Amino acid sequence: MPEATLTKKIIIAIDGPAASGKSTTAKQLAQKLSYTYIDTGAMYRAVTLKVLRDAFFEKIFSDELFLKKLLSETEVILKGEKVFLDGEEVTKDIRTNEVSSKVSKVSSLPLVREKLVEYQRNMGKARGVVMDGRDIGTIVFPDAELKVFMIADAKERAKRRYAELKAKSPSGDPGVTLETLEQEILQRDEDDRTRAIAPLRKPDDARELDTSKMTIEEQVAAIYELATDVISQLK
């Protein structure tokens, strides 16, 4: 497609379970389209990091007034690929296995979702964005012009997360076994699917993409083709 036709901007919503390749693919797709990439998962991870650091994890589930005050005093900002929590860069801190194991529980809280969904909608309302998460196509932007639901085999997702943790560890030790990661991913899937607020589900009008045997480059190319098709049909 000629580049001139790509000047029309759309919202691309990419949803799917943990470690299905959403964030890396969405980031590279945004670069290819010259769009803004919005990592909604990083926002939920930042809030999760805050409650874990301050030992408030249990309290936020039993004291709504406390949670409301905590959220009113919490600022999450995305600047490119960097994530800031209350003025501190936490880009690496939010990717620990501890945060990964707790984020689904924290993001199930209505007050947390309400605050972050409002922020996400404000960021994307100008269009020209690629946003990934669990409920982008169903809750945040149900009117997105392109919705993609990425899936992958749990074993493959565990391998990806294992390689990611290993690469980020100074010692090369991921600090967790592959088997444990697979169990945690399966548990996270269950938590995401069964939570009362904004459960993980494929939007009726989403294109499903199984990434189990796909490289990141192939994933980006597949969604780029879908995006250009959608843009070409805009009047």
UniProtKB/Swiss-Prot annotation:
It is an enzyme of class 2 (transferase). Disulfide bonds: none annotated. Belongs to the cytidylate kinase family. Type 1 subfamily. PANTHER family: CYTIDYLATE KINASE (PTHR21299:SF2), CYTIDYLATE KINASE/PANTOATE-BETA-ALANINE LIGASE (PTHR21299). It is found in: Cytoplasm. It comes from Chloroherpeton thalassium (strain ATCC 35110 / GB-78). Gene3D superfamilies: P-loop containing nucleotide triphosphate hydrolases. GO terms for biological process: nucleobase-containing small molecule interconversion; pyrimidine nucleotide metabolic process. GO terms for cellular component: cytosol. Its main location: cytoplasm. It catalyses: CMP + ATP = CDP + ADP; dCMP + ATP = dCDP + ADP. The keyword Protein biosynthesis does not apply. This is Cytidylate kinase. ATP binds at G16, P17, A18, A19, S20, G21, K22, S23, T24. The gene is cmk. InterPro entries: Cytidylate_kin (IPR003136), Cytidylate_kinase_dom (IPR011994), P-loop_NTPase (IPR027417). It comes from the Bacteria. One of its GO terms (molecular function) is ATP binding. Transmembrane segments: none annotated. Keywords: ATP-binding, Cytoplasm, Kinase, Nucleotide-binding, Transferase. The keyword Transferase applies. SUPFAM superfamilies: P-loop containing nucleoside triphosphate hydrolases (SSF52540). Its EC number is 2.7.4.25.
